[in-house]
Amino acid sequence: MLMVISPAKTLDFETPPTTGRFTQPQYLDHSQELITQLRELTPAQISELMHLSDKLAGLNAARFGSWNPAFTLDNAKQALLAFKGDVYTGLQAETLSDAQLDYAQDHLRMLSGLYGLLRPLDLMQPYRLEMGTRLANARGKDLYAFWGTQISEWLNEALAAQGDDLLLNLASTEYFSAVKRSALKARIIDTEFKDFKNGQYKIISFYAKKARGMMSRFVIEERINSPEALQAFDVKGYRYNREQSTPDKLVFLRNVVED
């Protein structure tokens, strides 16, 4: 089973990594093409394109300017340890053992607007480029056009390498839209996490993101390799709901938020 998750806006390049092991991103030629274009933008243009404050626009203009594909532990960090959003709070990658990191390296991928697809130990330099950014480029009107079927083809390669055709989608709609389902040689398993609020079960973004990270951790710890085994996920009060689920969409409900 191969999992895909979204990246995060929040980054941590200050905390020392918990491992000295790393790999290099596989698709830096594509990243370099984007960086070359992004360097032509002024901070004001970046602010308008990405809907950022002047301060954040200036920060990311500087990041684009200093981006250098000669990645080392001195100027970059492993992707799974660098991202620090809600998904990664749920995943708690900093507490994974070496054996669990090895498993994650084979069975987990992070989608990225700049890097396309990252493995957990791939080094990355800090950036801000959400997949939904409408950056017109030589390949089309936005980043979805830029990546085209490429991400799907890379996922096919990863699926073939890890031994089955199961792709567990734990990414947001914005990011999984960069995966062309028609180009995938995979059975896609989608997920929904709902919390009880105001008399009904609903998807609450903050909790759903954390749950995606917790399920990623669950798969890594238990070495899950089937949709049926995923039904046992019961972290922090979530329970599989058979009535709302289908074979290719697993729904988990929670009545009370657990710390």
Curated annotation (Swiss-Prot):
Gene Ontology biological-process annotations: response to hydroperoxide
GO cellular component: cytosol
InterPro entries: YaaA
Stated family: Belongs to the UPF0246 family.
HAMAP family, A to Z: UPF0246 (MF_00652)
Name listed for the protein in its UniProt record: UPF0246 protein PSPPH_1119
